[in-house]
UniProtKB/Swiss-Prot annotation:
Region of interest (Disordered), residue spans: 603-638
Record's compositionally biased regions (Low complexity): 603-618
Post-translational modification Phosphothreonine, affected residues: T199
Identification of the protein by name: Chaperone protein DnaK
Length: 638
């Protein structure tokens, strides 16, 4: 059985980790960073950029650079939070045929699952490069407060990326798992405050030691799936745009290019103000009007920043109160508070958490990496590499069906440990009713319309009978991923209907399959592009080396030979400008052949001398090498 990797698919950044023996290893990406921006860009030539390369070109390609896509996953286009987001992003958010929130890049319509799959592919490739073999299985984390549609959509993104998602686990639970392995004492109650780029979760977790086995049990969870660092950025962007409009009478929000530059500056300002009292925002030539170019120059103090985000920080405290109440605990009964997510680096956030829980939050957990590490540990549990950990997670929201009068009847209460199964018997509302519609809901409101509709299905061919006589057993079954299966059975006929909830929205199996094939096709394109780049690099090196040799040894070269070499160089330089790898390879070989005699002349005599000299050095140096290096290091340190 291969390794099951752990992926933290974040709103702003993503991270991948794997279990190596008993240790958890966070895997750096190809650029050497331990986290990767969750940004996907579509270039004019069809190339798809992911991570740092996508982030670097965002200012010059704002409409085709997609960020914070996780906030759209599993959501409807007409959701109030999505409507609000449309004004804050530089790309186009559209409604799909089924009403889901999708994005448009050029004339191409993309689901958030497809875009997220790009980031997952990058994480998969990062792990494969490190492990040296193909990776097909993963544990992916989601915010604890994600509903069923959002969980299913995340699983679909994994499938499109070529991964079998062995488990979906909640981010705070994953962080507690990483923390609980070595830092927590037995029988502790911990609060995981997880404020990431786009989502907020609070989980109250009990870690117990049962005969040498760590049991990590979630007592309650709560949160807000549209609250995070992106919102901190947005209020700074709003402030900058408002002040600039007052000063220059130009609305930066109408200029996509300017808006992207302001967004980058806002993110930098937020980060700087976590360690400094004041920051400067300098954006020359940010925009222009009839009077000429406009420059943005502004100072933001930490006090101003805190006044802008105060309402957002306070929004995170109400879920904390609810989570404690649901767990039947007071703040004083919490042994440790763990901060997870990059946004917890903001001093005001840390102060608010300290004030609410009455204790200093722990700082010995890396807020960017803990979630991926916990996912890797869960991967180790599933593959059998880790056998001393038991994870008991919960469902974040109540589940039920709509009954007479538009009321929601709950079958499974929120914070129920999963997996779980619950059945309840219902009946008909009319005489001789031959069919019933089972409308599945998720949420805490008594009125059906106030909750999230997960989907509906019909149970028909019910034998005629007076109202209230037929007995229809409805069963809710939640798996370990928090994904729901619902069945309804007429007890008289044993006729049964059941569905895995995919909501009224979501992707069909055919759509997912098409996206998987599309992703595979792109993988082949990406491989071809990589081969082309490598061929160009090799050709460039050949041109540079040959020109250098001609400069150094040109006097001793016959005119005809020199002319042939120069023609071969010109041909290869022309080939490099094109996109045909075969032509580049052919012209590279032609230059190698044309310059063979020149290379032989250049390296014959000096090469022999250099070899002899090198041999002599090796003989003389002997054991002194270690001492010499040791002395040199000490000199540097003095």
């Amino acid at each position: 059985m291969g390794k099951i990797i752990g992926i933290d698919l974040g709103t702003t950044n993503s991270c991948v980790a794997v279990m190596e023996g008993k240790e958890t290893k966070v895997i750096p990406n190809a650029e050497g960073a331990r986290t990767t921006p969750s940004i996907v860009a579509y270039a004019d030539d069809g190339e798809v950029l992911v991570g740092d390369s996508a982030k670097r070109q965002a200012v010059t390609n704002p409409e085709n650079t997609l960020f914070a896509i996780k906030r759209l996953i599993g959501r409807r286009a007409d959701d109030a939070v999505v409507e609000k987001d449309k004004d804050m992003v530089s790309y186009k958010i559209i409604a799909a045929d089924n009403g889901d929130a999708w994005v448009q890049v050029g004339d191409k319509k993309l689901s958030p699952q497809e875009v997220s799959a790009r980031t997952l592919m990058k994480m998969k490739k990062t792990a494969e490069d490190y492990l040296g073999h193909e990776v097909t299985e993963a544990v992916i984390t989601v915010p604890a407060y994600f509903n069923d549609s959002q969980r299913q959509a995340t699983k679909d993104a994994g499938k499109i990326a070529g991964l079998e998602v062995k488990r979906i686990i909640n981010e705070p639970t994953a962080a507690a798992l990483a923390y609980g392995m070595d830092k927590v004492k037995a029988d502790s109650k911990i609060a995981v405050y997880d404020l990431g780029g786009g989502t907020f979760d609070i989980s109250i977790i009990e870690v117990a030691d049962l005969d040498g086995e760590k049991q990590v049990e979630v007592l309650s969870t709560n949160g807000d799936t549209f609250l995070g660092g992106e919102d901190f950025d947005n209020v700074i962007v709003d402030y900058i745009a408002t002040e600039f409009k007052k000063d220059q009478n130009v609305d930066l929000k109408l200029d996509k290019l300017a808006l992207q530059r302001v967004r980058e500056a806002a993110e930098k300002a937020k980060i700087e103000l976590s360690s400094r009292e004041q920051t400067d925002i300098n954006l020359p030539y940010v925009t222009a009007d009839a009077t000429g170019p406009k420059h943005l120059n502004m100072k933001i103090t930490r006090a101003k920043f805190e006044s802008l985000i105060e309402g957002l920080v306070q929004r995170s405290i109400d879920p904390c109160k609810t989570a404690l109440k649901d767990a039947g605990l007071s703040a004083s009964e919490i042994d440790d508070v763990i901060l997870v997510g990059g946004s917890t680096r903001v001093p005001m956030v840390q102060a608010a958490v300290k004030e609410f829980f009455g204790k200093e939050p722990r700082k010995d957990v890396n807020p960017d990496e803990a979630v991926a590490m916990g996912a890797a540990i869960q991967g180790g549990v599933l593959s059998g590499d880790v056998n001393d950990v038991l994870l008991l997670d919960v469902t974040p929201l109540s589940l039920g069906i709509e009954t007479m009068g538009g009321v929601m009847t709950k079958l499974i209460e929120k914070n129920t440990t999963i997996p779980t199964r619950k059945s309840q018997t219902f009946s008909t509302a009319e005489d001789n009713q031959s069919a019933v519609t089972i409308h599945v809901l998720q949420g805490e409101r008594e009125v059906s319309s106030g909750n999230k509709s997960l989907g509906q299905f019909n149970l028909d061919e019910i034998p005629p009978a007076p109202r209230g006589t037929p007995q229809i057993e409805v069963t809710f079954d939640i798996d370990a991923n928090g994904i729901l299966n619902v069945s309804a059975k007429d007890k008289a006929t044993n006729k049964e209907q059941h569905i895995t909830i995919q909501a009224s929205s979501g992707l069909s199996e055919d759509e997912i399959e098409a996206m998987v094939k599309d992703a595979e096709a792109h993988a082949a394109e990406d491989a071809k592009l990589k081969e082309l780049v490598e061929a160009r690099n090799q050709a460039d090196a050949m041109v540079h080396g040959t020109k250098k040799l001609l400069d150094e040894q040109g006097e001793g070269v016959e005119a005809a030979e020199k002319e042939a070499i120069e023609k071969a160089i010109a041909d290869l330089e022309e080939a490099i400008k094109g996109d045909d790898k075969a032509v580049i390879d052919e012209k590279t070989q032609a230059l190698a052949t044309a310059s063979q005699k020149l290379a032989e002349k250049a390296y014959a005599q000096p090469g022999a001398e250099a070899g002899a000299e090198q041999q002599g050095s090796a003989n003389n140096a002997d054991d002194d090498i270690v001492d010499a290096e040791f002395e040199e290091v000490n000199d540097d340190k003095k």
